[in-house]
Amino acid sequence: NCSLCKYRVQIVGFEQQVGEPQKAHHLAVRALSANLNEPLATQPSRYKPYLPHPIEAESFRIIAEGRDWTPFPQDQLTILQRLVHTSGDFDAVNDMYFSPGAVDSGIRALLRCKRILTDVTMVQTGLKRALLEELGIDTWCGVHDRETHLMSEQYGITRSAAGIRRGWEKFGNDVVVSIGDAPTAIAEATRLIRDHGWRPQLVIGLPVGFVGTRETKEDLRRCLQVPRITNRGTRGGSPWAASVVNGLMIDALNGLAAQQASEQAAEQAAEPAAVPREDVAG
């Protein structure tokens, strides 16, 4: 769906956004007042690759050498290694499930939609603030809002489930959903997807616990309508869900930085080389 037209006409899946102010999704557009004759290569880089703290870098060096990562797809490694870092357990990645194209869908969604919906504030606070600011991504969690509490009482659902429902009402499909605490939030998300045509760009479902956790994760894994990242079993938690999003943001930022560097190198290579002039004796 066109990200501009959806604000002017009603489109299925974006009904809640009709009439809202438009948001530009172009990440490298120069202002009209810029010097259009100045090549992009001479302008300062906007994006720089993610630079971890030295202790964090050493941790990931140990993780990279701590097991054989060749069986795992290359595009999943950032997320999987961050999950090992979060859990302190190399076996944490063995039960992970990624639907086909989930990582690419998540990266594209973060860069285009720029909004993350979480079930609890602990997931929200686990997201790297510097990456959110660098990429211009907003987060929203309604679990403690009065409106969420009233909806929870009215419909007899948990506040986490009500927060997910309110997120669907507020943002429509333009959102990445990250659930790390409540199985009821996964249950509500899959219900909205199947019964109401909700199509979030990615659903991350990694709650921890013993009541309903296995079942809701398995139900999410079978929810073919949307890209999804989850696992099997009882392990998980808010730090896990936040780590997945952090991994996606790191890959998104590194991708932007690499693309920008490539474009600048191409611009420089395309510039005609200066031809020295020979002095002519008078």
What are these regions (language model features)?
Residues 10, 21-22, 260-268, 272, ...:
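Intrinsically disordered, low-complexity repeat/linker tracts enriched for polar/charged residues
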